[in-house]
Amino acid sequence: MSLQTLIEQATNPPESGSAASSPFSTDSFDASVMSTYGRFPLALERGAGCRVWDTQGKEYLDFVAGIATCTLGHAHPAMVEAVTRQIQKLHHVSNLYYIPEQGELAQWIIQHSCADRVFFCNSGAEANEAAIKLARKYAHTVLDIEKPIILTANASFHGRTLATITATGQAKYQKYFDPLVPGFHYVNYNDISAVEAAISELDEGDYRVAAILIEPLQGEGGVRPGDVEYFQKLRQICDDTGILLMFDEVQVGMGRSGKLWGYEYLGVEPDIFTSAKGLGGGIPIGAMMSKKFCDVFQPGEHASTFGGNPFACGVALAVCQTLERENILQNVQDRGEQLRSGLRAIAAKYPHHLTEVRGWGLINGLELAADIPLTAADVVKAAINEGLLLVPAGPKVVRFVPPLIVTEAEINTALKLLEKALATVTA
């Protein structure tokens, strides 16, 4: 079945012959589900391509994609086929046994990256936890560091577990969760002098910097691309000192930047990097990749019950193969240029409200002026009313992360809907 057929079916779903189910209730939901999200008053029930529909039947153009996760959009035929095939074949067994789908996916990643080894898990936070553990063991057993320190960046985001909120250089994610995990130190992003100073200052007694964990492009921190010169100097520092260079590619990796991996924009290779979000196209899966020299894990030192299961790996492999077979990276580059051009044209019409457009491929941010009360959430709410889903990246940046299959016509439609939303909130 083609994607266009799926979209048509989602637009005009067949009427159910059974009795109507109870209407969706946000009150019932809120009474049952923990309040870990500040949710918009919108309940989505189906999707196809770059479109989703709410429980009232209203259609939206989805430029959130599960926050940079639905690589191939919703109900893509390749994913539908892979899900159906794998669930009928084998969906879960323990990692005590060899899992062919896991091996195939690992080999695909290795063939399409700088990695030599892969560890599979279920999310970006888990992948970053694995990277932190691997770096710490390497520090103890290879670098002979008694108390290793990992440098991370201010305004970074690495996950919601206790170690990854500590790695995250944003105090708002750490509030109320003391005591935090020791062994992290923050430096300003794209500031090489801050890195050099930290390495010098922290080299005292049993303490030494063992690794640097950083995003090629800061996503939650406001869609801020890394500077090429900065990252190349980071690589040189790590080569000179033995410090591990680790990249968090959870949001920018798997083609979202227009290249398969964000590090390809920067002209350097990490020793360790992580992936999740777009890897499974919306099916939960994460991965931590490393060069052979720093693969120091032994059996029993790290594990995941669900990580690398046949179902997730089988679907993720289909996503990866579809990216390659359909040359989707070229679409990401073309549509990204179109989107940024359109956003800049809109920004020029609102010079007192909109200050900058930035990003790579199909991860882009529209920054609002700091000296006005208008927030990213205000724009997102207005866009929802117009039928466009967007997501904030901090209080002053509106983020655009559509599925990588988005079309030229859909970009144009999104830009028109955004203009309507902006006209409302700036009136």
UniProtKB/Swiss-Prot annotation:
Alphabetized GO MF terms: identical protein binding; N2-acetyl-L-ornithine:2-oxoglutarate 5-aminotransferase activity; pyridoxal phosphate binding
Residue segments, region Disordered: 1-23
EC category: transferase
Keyword presence, Cytoplasm: yes
Alphabetized UniProt keyword annotations: Amino-acid biosynthesis, Aminotransferase, Arginine biosynthesis, Cytoplasm, Pyridoxal phosphate, Transferase
Pfam families: Aminotran_3 (PF00202)
Pathway where it operates: Amino-acid biosynthesis; L-arginine biosynthesis; N(2)-acetyl-L-ornithine from L-glutamate: step 4/4
Superkingdom, taxonomy of origin: Bacteria
Localization: Cytoplasm
Free-text cofactor note: Binds 1 pyridoxal phosphate per subunit.
Residues annotated to bind pyridoxal 5'-phosphate: 124-125, 157, 248-251, 305
GO cellular component: cytoplasm
Keyword Transferase attributed: yes
Protein EC: 2.6.1.11
Post-translational modification N6-(pyridoxal phosphate)lysine, affected residues: 277
UniProt-annotated binding residues for N(2)-acetyl-L-ornithine: 160, 304
Cofactor(s) it depends on: pyridoxal 5'-phosphate
GO terms of biological process kind: L-arginine biosynthetic process
Catalytic activity: N(2)-acetyl-L-ornithine + 2-oxoglutarate = N-acetyl-L-glutamate 5-semialdehyde + L-glutamate
PANTHER family documented for this protein: ACETYLORNITHINE AMINOTRANSFERASE, MITOCHONDRIAL, AMINOTRANSFERASE CLASS III
Subunit and partners: Homodimer.
Similarity-based family: Belongs to the class-III pyridoxal-phosphate-dependent aminotransferase family. ArgD subfamily.
Note: May also have succinyldiaminopimelate aminotransferase activity, thus carrying out the corresponding step in lysine biosynthesis.
Protein name in UniProt: Acetylornithine aminotransferase
Organism the protein comes from: Nostoc sp. (strain PCC 7120 / SAG 25.82 / UTEX 2576)
